[in-house]
Design a protein with these regions (language model features):
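A short hydrophobic beta-strand segment most commonly corresponding to one strand
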Residues: 87-88, 130-146
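A short beta-strand-loop-beta hairpin characteristic of the jelly-roll/cupin
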Residues: 70-77, 82-84, 90-109
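Non-heme Fe(II)/2-oxoglutarate
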Residues: 1-56
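Conserved metal-binding segment of the jelly-roll/cupin
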Residues: 68, 106-123
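Short beta-strand His + acidic residue motifs that chelate non-heme Fe in jelly-roll/DSBH
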Residues: 76-78, 121-129
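Residues that flank catalytic or metal-binding motifs in active/ligand-binding sites
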Residues: 57-59, 83-87, 94, 120, ...
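A short coil-to-beta-strand element that immediately follows conserved catalytic motifs
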Residues: 54-64
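Short beta-strand segments enriched in hydrophobic/aromatic residues
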Residues: 65-67, 91, 140-142
Length: 149
């Protein structure tokens, strides 16, 4: 994903809100899987990660690349999809992080997988110590569990 051959696409926003006008409010994205577009030509490259998560149904898989900024820029708090799970896989270590409305922060550490209820409001940040901050964001339904008492 850190290769110069990785197809990144410019997005003039980071969250769904188009109200924010800020010089750092953009990112580069690769949608591995989208409910609108289907799988990308390089979808198979993300399969080892999806196999580890083992989702019941995958809704969206996208990689986000945020260029370095002069200071850590915190993005808008948001939720992803309703009533499912979100996993964030951190590609590289940097001083960016994911923050939650509760005040909890999770540092960007390479090969870390963070999983949480998609209804939790969270925000990403940029980094200042590496050229880019790269994560993979996965929204999915987990396999149903049956409990018999």
């Amino acid at each position: 994903m850190m290769s110069s051959r990785m197809p990144w696409f410019y997005h003039p926003y980071v969250t769904r809100s188009d109200k924010i006008e800020h010089q750092y409010e953009f990112q580069f994205v690769h949608k591995f899987l989208s409910y609108v577009q289907g799988p990308s030509p390089i979808y198979k490259t993300i399969m080892p990660l999806l196999d580890k998560i083992d989702p019941f149904r995958t809704i969206r898989v996208k990689a986000n690349l945020n260029p370095r900024t002069v200071k850590n820029e915190t993005r808008e708090m948001h939720t992803d999809w309703e009533n499912c799970l979100t996993s964030i896989y951190y590609i590289n270590t940097n001083n960016g992080y994911t923050s939650f409305e509760s005040g909890c922060t999770v540092p960007s550490k390479a090969n870390r997988l963070l999983t949480f209820n998609s209804n939790l409001r969270h925000a990403s940040t940029t980094c200042t110590d590496e050229k880019v901050r790269v994560v993979v964001n996965i929204n999915y339904y987990s396999k149903p569990t049956i409990s018999i008492k």
